[in-house]
A protein has these predicted regions:
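Anion-binding (especially nucleotide phosphate/pyrophosphate-binding) glycine-rich loop
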Residues: 3-130
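Structural signature of FAD isoalloxazine-binding scaffolds in flavoprotein oxidoreductases
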Residues: 32-33, 39-44, 69-87, 135-165, ...
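Short, conserved charged micro-motifs
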Residues: 46-49, 195-199
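Short, glycine- and charge-enriched coil/turn segments that flank and shape catalytic ligand pockets
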Residues: 56, 90-96, 158-160, 180-181, ...
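Flexible, small-/acidic-enriched active-site or ligand-binding loops
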Residues: 168-177
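Single conserved hydrophobic/aromatic residue that forms the stacking wall/gate
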Residues: 202-209
Length: 209
């Protein structure tokens, strides 16, 4: 791995690029070694610029780390974790919202309830991020990501941004057919119009025995 090109990129972009960076604090098990190169882009422009200099290297995208075991030996793989600007959540219609894929599932559920949208209450029980939820088609209490997902915006490892409709994705139990050379950027969800009080009532989920 030619570290000089990464150091030049860091100097030119003042980016959040780190070397020999421990990943232990980025997963819930607090295990794993150090990434030779770790990048946390704060916006899409930074991410595109970085991807253009790393086409020949293996890459892995990190989410919330709630369902992840990291090896002590990571080799020369590059690790990418989306920054805070990829966790924005906003309304785009009376019954639709868009969430950055580094948003925590619970934050999306809370946002929907606060805005009188029903359907995403189940996300409050899923410990993870939107991106990981899409990848695994996470779900509980009879609902899954695919039930409310309209489309996702993605970027491939060559830096090309595109949108994929849910109907063009094959979802299964805790899986989907999207290739692993895609980074999920944002997701659009369609909910049911309700009101805040009713939506929060739905958060009182059945007691597990």
């Amino acid at each position: 791995m030619n570290m000089q090109e990464f150091k030049i990129f860091k100097d030119q972009n003042n980016s959040n690029l780190k070397f020999d960076f421990s990943l232990k604090n980025l997963n819930w098990m607090n295990i794993g070694g150090s990434a030779k190169v770790f990048f946390k882009p704060e916006n899409l422009k930074e991410l595109i610029s970085f991807l253009k200099i790393v086409p020949k290297y293996k890459k892995h995208v990190l989410g919330a780390g709630s369902n992840l075991l990291i090896s002590e030996k990571l080799g020369e793989k590059i690790f990418i974790k989306l920054g805070k600007n990829f966790s924005n959540i906003s309304l785009i219609d009376d019954n639709k919202l868009i969430a950055g894929c580094s948003s925590l599932d619970k934050n999306v559920s809370d946002f929907a309830c606060e805005n009188g949208l029903s359907g995403l209450e189940f996300l409050s029980c899923i410990p993870g991020s939107v991106g990981g939820g899409i990848r695994m088609n996470s779900g509980c209490f009879g609902s899954e990501f695919k039930d409310f997902l309209v489309s996702i915006q993605v970027i491939d490892f060559e830096g090309k941004v595109s949108s994929i409709r849910t109907k063009d994705i094959i979802f299964g139990y805790r899986k989907c057919n999207l290739p692993y050379d895609l980074i999920f950027l944002s997701a659009t969800f369609e909910c049911k119009k309700s009101n805040k009080a009713v939506s929060y009532t739905h958060l009182t989920l059945p007691t597990m025995i």
